[in-house]
A protein has these predicted regions:
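Conserved glycine-rich cofactor-binding loop
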Residues: 25-26
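Active-site helix of classical SDR
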Residues: 135, 171, 179
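C-terminal substrate-recognition "lid" of short-chain dehydrogenase/reductases
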Residues: 222-255
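Conserved NAD(P)H cofactor-binding loop of Rossmann-fold oxidoreductase domains
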Residues: 97-108, 252-253
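Short, small/polar-rich loop/turn modules that mediate ligand/substrate recognition or access, typified
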Residues: 187, 192, 243-245
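Substrate-binding pocket helix/loop in short-chain dehydrogenase/reductase
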Residues: 105-112, 116-121, 213
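Residue(s) in the substrate-gating loop at a strand-loop-helix junction
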Residues: 154
Length: 256
């Protein structure tokens, strides 16, 4: 049984730390906000949507930044705003969770032959390039705090997926490679960079037919957003102080 005293001491140690999270509007993003907030972190959320009036967590619009991550100019503008909001210019964690995965007009996955060039470009700008732009722009703040970066990839980045489109899957495979490159480049700055690769997670955007895929998952169930958030938290804290360049599979054994 967890000692309440040790829990309070742990929260005290975490207070004053700041996380910037992209893609916070639902699912894994929501769960991540809750996990870090419960540990005393300040969470600055970023999404293409304005701050919702019915926001499920306590933070207000002062901890939310609306940004179009497909637009390098707007991302640069948002990055400047992020830095202006940081206490003492320190950023303890950056989680790149935002991603898009467009479907065809019939709701089916877009393969290589069906995906237009503009769609490829848009997906890569959000899913891959924005990660680079944010990491470059926030480099000094992360280094000052000896912080951590977590990139959210996907099981679709390592195998053909029945629902995830070709451009989405390719962008996630590229993000896994980028994570290794970033770990090498950010390591000398004292910043760790890792990735998590979720499998089938029980969110509101599950594709029809996902229930059949559960039969092939060794643990026999979908993952929960809170389980993904716990892994992200681990990679952003001192619990993983000697872990960098890794991609953690969170899929109930689906990848084996």
């Amino acid at each position: 049984m967890t000692d309440p005293k040790s829990q309070n001491e742990g929260r005290h140690l975490e207070e004053g730390r700041t996380l910037i999270l992209t893609g916070a509007s639902r699912g894994i993003g929501h769960a991540t906000v809750k996990r870090f907030s419960s540990a005393g972190w300040r969470v600055i959320t970023c999404s293409r949507h304005a701050f919702p009036e019915n926001c499920p967590w306590a933070a207000g619009p002062e901890d939310h930044i609306q940004v179009d991550l497909s637009d390098p100019a707007d991302t640069a503008r948002a990055t400047s705003e992020m830095k202006a909001r940081l206490k003492d210019g320190m950023l303890h964690a950056l989680v790149n969770n935002a991603a898009i995965s467009p479907k065809g007009t019939d709701g089916k996955r877009l393969g290589v032959l069906e995906t237009e060039t503009e769609t490829w470009r848009h997906i890569f700008e959000v899913n891959l390039f924005s990660t680079i732009w944010l990491a470059q722009g926030l480099r000094e703040a992360l280094a000052k705090a000896h912080g951590a970066i977590v990139n959210v990839t996907s099981i679709a980045g390592s195998r053909v997926h029945p629902f995830a489109g070709a451009a989405y899957a390719t962008s996630k495979a590229a993000l896994a490679a980028l994570t290794r490159e970033m770990a090498a480049d950010f390591g000398p700055l004292g910043v760790r960079v890792n990735a998590i690769a979720p499998g089938e997670i029980n969110t509101a955007i599950l594709s029809p037919g996902t229930e059949k895929m559960v039969e092939g998952i060794p643990l026999g169930r979908l993952g929960e957003p809170a389980e993904v958030a716990k892994a992200i938290y681990y990679l952003c804290t001192d619990q993983s102080s000697y872990v960098t360049g890794a991609e953690l599979h969170i899929n109930g054994g689906q990848h084996v």
